[in-house]
Curated annotation (Swiss-Prot):
Positions of Kelch repeats: 132-184, 186-242, 244-293, 295-342
Region (Disordered): 1-34, 361-452, 570-632
Protein name listed in UniProt: F-box only protein 42
Quaternary structure and partners: Component of some SCF complex, composed of CUL1, SKP1, RBX1 and FBXO42. Interacts (via the kelch domain) with p53/TP53; interaction is direct.
Amino acid sequence: MASSSDSEDDSVMAVDQEETALEGTMEQDEDPHPVLEVEETRHNRSMSELPEEVLEYILSFLSPYQEHKTAALVCKQWYRLIKGVAHQCYHGFMKAVQEGNIQWESRTYPYPGTPITQRFSHSACYYDANQSMYVFGGCTQSSCNAAFNDLWRLDLNSKEWIRPLASGSYPSPKAGATLVVYKDLLVLFGGWTRPSPYPLHQPERFFDEIHTYSPSKNWWNCIVTTHGPPPMAGHSSCVIGDKMIVFGGSLGSRQMSNEVWVLDLEQWAWSKPNISGPSPHPRGGQSQIVIDDTTLLILGGCGGPNALFKDAWLLHMHPGPWAWQPLKVENEDHGAPELWCHPACRVGQCVVVFSQAPSGRAPLSPSLNSRPSPISATPPALVPETREYRSQSPVRSMDEAPCVNGRWGTLRPRAQRQTPSGSREGSLSPARGDGSPILNGGNLSPGTVAVGGASLDSPVQVVSPSTPSASDGYDLKVGLSLAPRRGSLPDQKDLRLSSIDLNWDLKSASSSSHVDSIDNRTVAGSVRHPPEQTNGVHTPPHVASALAGAVSPGALRRSLEAIKAMSSKGPSASAALSPPLGSSPSSPGSQSLSSGETVPNSRPGPAQGDGHSLPPIARRLGHHPPQSLNVGKPLYQSMNCKPMQMYVLDIKDTKEKGRVKWKVFTSSSVVGPPETSLHTVVQGRGELIVFGGLMDKKQNVKYYPKTNALYFVRAKR
């Protein structure tokens, strides 16, 4: 009964509230002023009225640095939510690294602040007090004799480079030093620098100096110690408690070290601990990871020429004698190819290394959030020149051509060998007419038609002649405007490529005897992927539609391959190379190659090369032929198919089972920007910062930003 009476009272109260609401509504209809007050109330709603789940999701887009700190000061609710967001950011990033579910953000192009000088072999560390990354020293690729002693600070909240003008005793200009954080100080130790060019034959200089930098005071201080390690560079160091542990390094004169030194950061005194058992080989350039307060992990390194290490060692720092323990490395085939010049960084129970992608053909990361690269725009036509270049055979005494005026890979002409008939022996080069420029680029463009309307979509290999005489006489014009060659060969056929005419010197008997047979293919069908080695000509798998007046080795090579394919089929195929004068290769419909055989016109579309397309770089090349390419490999591999990939080493079973294991990823998100070496990797708040480094000259670094690039690796949203 009591419950029924209570329900009745509740119903009565509900009715009374409805009546009151109706009366209030009637009064509002009579008086317009309360309506304005209600509308004001609706417009004055704040974010505090949102559900906490929605608010927490919105706050997760804030920068984990200063923006988190500022948002936590708004109210108690936001303070509590920011703590959860920061925790989720950290652990979410660790999980993303373990699963390979990351994204890359690029700061390769000009960003706020004074641009830092391009460098490699520099030192870097993260200082949480002002949420910045500090970079010291290094050297530059433009001058091997130049080393820096400048200090830069990257504000990770604004992504702005700041150069603090510090006072005190500056360190010497050097590279290969280590920079670690101890309390409110940055400790710099070791390093090396190249000698001045004159006088000649001076040795490199190595340092054993210790400098400290105080970010709060903006002050450098030189620490004088005694009975310390010899001058060294390329060593590794870390801080555990109030001790800095230093291992290995290069001592100069091709001498490496495997000694361990300990610096007391309170007393600034060196000591050398007693270590029992076998020890790692002397090395430099290794990575040193802190496992816990009594254990260190040493990974990789270089012991000298042809002595690159991929091993892993544990250093147990017990109260008694210290001891080394070798670790078993599992899934080594899926590990980083090179460890000595690619530093490692710990993220949770994993160690992250950024090294070269194993396949060498993986595309660059599609998640690089930067402005379009200069290599991704459609280039203008290359301006013809009057000089002549001839291809070099990959089999030669020197791996690369010398560097002349900063250009690598200059193709030098060969002596021509004349035959009794007056033509050059084994020559497969074209004879150009006055109005027959050659196409630009390494491929025929998607809309370009070859051999009576057929489109060649895949890279085609030009096989070097088998005989020395044919090799000496092999001639190829690269990016040039040449005078027509008359009288070389009696039979000349007209091969039309798009709107551009190419006059080729055909000699069926000579070409069939000196050119190897190729796989069964038709001009209309797709061509199989050739081997990577070419005859000294480097060609990207896709080049956009070229304009008249441009010359490229790829167009010559592909057209030459079409001639070989047709000449191997007999006289009927050779006759089809000369289309009627009234026919246009770019006319709609299909055109006849021989009786009963037609080839439809190819539609425009991205050309495919090894499973992915690659835009050209001719705009950056200007009117020069490619000069800094890797001889014997296609251009797209030399420039764009050596990306940097994330490798993850699982270290959770290091102490218990004495093993480490490389993780296997199938996701393409681990593939990032072009590979660099001697860069730095620093862990911030829920991200990794990769800065600087040295890019191999074989990756066409002259036309791609290289050594002051800045990348952020974060968890993929």
